């Protein structure tokens, strides 16, 4: 693949100051089941003290892109609170901001965004009249990765493209979840199909497909034209992958940007890191991966920091009065936790968690404000926020029993536990859960 960007071709400052970023953060993430019943997927916790959307937003700031709009829709309350408290530090007087663009009632009485393209279209008047960008970078707010978007912007301008799509190589067996493309030697897209049942392989790589990352750079005027045209198309699904990108392809305006050119997070073997944590298994695994000695994703890297809004909690404390208890091993522990004579291994614990005597927590992701009683055994679990695990409960030991009590992942490996499930087990009547996430 030919390298498009040449040193000194563009003034990076002029490029980023004329770019508006739109982060699409309105999705539910239905494959995460009860984990996203009360929160949008981008607001889901990740890595001990962050939210998923913090990765896309941190990439923007680290790339010098400080004009950001976050498009919200489904169960947006916790996401909006997170943005207000954790991402309001940019100086408005310098034209820098993280603005929130929630779904709102239109003149034609439509209230919900009908697709990814419609989410941008319904905000087009604001974009044109208020932000007035020359380029628009569109991101999904629910992926885990580190990327310098300014490199992609430079490639976009140098290529002469009207639209550039971020791409990554994935195993062909997984490519049916994404848009799949073929490119020529100059990275011009020659074919594109959204979520094909039988994904085409890359030339010379029969087990690999080139897929869309859901990241697009548009010349602003070209995007306005394409969205005006798309909204009037019969039987449209109002989706970038299904409707807009194929039209860009027909016009010869679509180019690809390989993620390897702008990736800022590589593992010790030099492999690029990008995760779509859209299932219980992938969410659990991506968190558990962080506890290894040399994780694929380095959350401690100060050269490309992942910002957020960590809870201001007291330091965690550990009491071990019995020598036969194996203490904490290979785990991430958030602030404000109290651990008493409990064994914790290969797990990610968020903030304000209490674990009582002689309990064992192994390969678990435990979200904030969970209480785990005495003599409990938890293995391969995702424990949702504010769960209270009663004394002696075992989860992840007898899968047949767990199937009747909790949510089991599609692979049968991971168990999701929520407060509602625990209340049903206790025989309590279930009303509306009203906690602020």
UniProtKB/Swiss-Prot annotation:
Pathway field: Glycan biosynthesis; glycogen biosynthesis
Reaction(s) this enzyme catalyzes, per UniProt: alpha-D-glucose 1-phosphate + ATP + H(+) = ADP-alpha-D-glucose + diphosphate
Entry protein name: Glucose-1-phosphate adenylyltransferase
Keywords, in A-Z order: ATP-binding, Carbohydrate metabolism, Glycogen biosynthesis, Glycogen metabolism, Nucleotide-binding, Nucleotidyltransferase, Transferase
Residues at which alpha-D-glucose 1-phosphate binds: 113, 179, 194-195, 212
Source species of the chain: Haemophilus influenzae (strain 86-028NP)
One example GO MF annotation: glucose-1-phosphate adenylyltransferase activity
Domain of life: Bacteria
EC numbers: 2.7.7.27
Similarity comment: Belongs to the bacterial/plant glucose-1-phosphate adenylyltransferase family.
Function: Involved in the biosynthesis of ADP-glucose, a building block required for the elongation reactions to produce glycogen. Catalyzes the reaction between ATP and alpha-D-glucose 1-phosphate (G1P) to produce pyrophosphate and ADP-Glc.
Top-level class of the enzyme under EC nomenclature: transferase
Pfam families: Hexapep_GlmU (PF24894), NTP_transferase (PF00483)
InterPro entries attached to this UniProt entry: ADP-Glc_PPase, ADP_Glu_pyroP_CS, GlgC_bac, GlmU/GlgC-like_hexapep, NTP_transferase_dom, Nucleotide-diphossugar_trans, Trimer_LpxA-like_sf
One Gene Ontology biological process: glycogen biosynthetic process
Summary of subunit composition and partner proteins: Homotetramer.
């Amino acid at each position: 693949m030919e390298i498009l960007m040449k040193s000194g071709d563009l003034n990076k400052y002029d490029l980023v100051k004329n770019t508006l970023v739109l982060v699409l953060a309105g999705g539910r993430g239905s494959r995460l089941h009860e984990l996203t019943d009360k929160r949008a997927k981008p607001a889901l916790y990740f890595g001990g003290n962050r939210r998923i959307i913090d990765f896309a937003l941190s990439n923007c700031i680290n790339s010098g892109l400080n004009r950001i709009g976050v498009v919200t829709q489904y169960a947006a309350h916790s996401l909006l609170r997170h943005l207000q408290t954790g991402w309001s530090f940019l100086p408005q007087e310098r034209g820098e901001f993280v603005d929130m663009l929630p779904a709102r009632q239109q003149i034609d009485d439509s209230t919900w965004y009908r697709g990814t393209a419609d989410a941008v279209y319904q905000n087009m008047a604001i974009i044109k009249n208020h932000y007035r960008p020359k380029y628009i970078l569109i991101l999904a707010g629910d992926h885990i990765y580190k990327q310098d978007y300014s490199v992609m912007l430079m490639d976009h301008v140098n290529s002469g493209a009207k639209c550039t799509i971020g791409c990554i190589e994935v195993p062909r067996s997984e490519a049916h979840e994404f848009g799949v493309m073929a490119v020529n030697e100059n990275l011009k897209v020659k074919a594109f199909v959204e979520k094909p049942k039988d994904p085409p392989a890359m030339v010379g790589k029969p087990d690999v497909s080139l897929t869309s990352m859901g990241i697009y750079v548009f010349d602003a005027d070209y995007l306005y034209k394409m969205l005006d045209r798309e909204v009037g198309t019969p039987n449209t699904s109002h989706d970038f992958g299904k409707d807009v990108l194929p039209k860009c392809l027909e016009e010869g305006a679509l180019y690809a940007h390989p993620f390897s050119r702008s990736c800022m997070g590589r593992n010790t073997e030099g492999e690029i890191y990008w995760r779509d944590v859209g299932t219980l298994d992938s969410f659990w695994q991506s968190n558990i991966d962080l506890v290894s000695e040399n994780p694929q994703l380095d959350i401690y890297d100060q050269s490309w920091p992942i910002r957020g809004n960590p809870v201001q909690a007291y330091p965690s404390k550990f009491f071990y009065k019995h020598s036969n208890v194996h203490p904490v091993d290979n785990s991430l522990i958030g602030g404000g936790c109290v651990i008493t004579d409990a064994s914790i291994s290969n797990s990610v614990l968020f903030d304000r968690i209490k674990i009582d005597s002689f309990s064992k927590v192994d390969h678990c992701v435990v979200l904030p404000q969970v209480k785990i009683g005495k003599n409990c055994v938890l293995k391969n679990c995702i424990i949702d926020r504010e769960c209270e695990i009663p004394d002696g409960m075992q989860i992840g030991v007898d899968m047949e029993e767990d199937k009747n009590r909790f949510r089991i992942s599609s692979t049968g490996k991971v168990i999701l536990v929520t407060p509602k499930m625990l209340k049903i087990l206790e025989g309590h009547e279930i009303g509306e859960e009203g906690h602020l996430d």
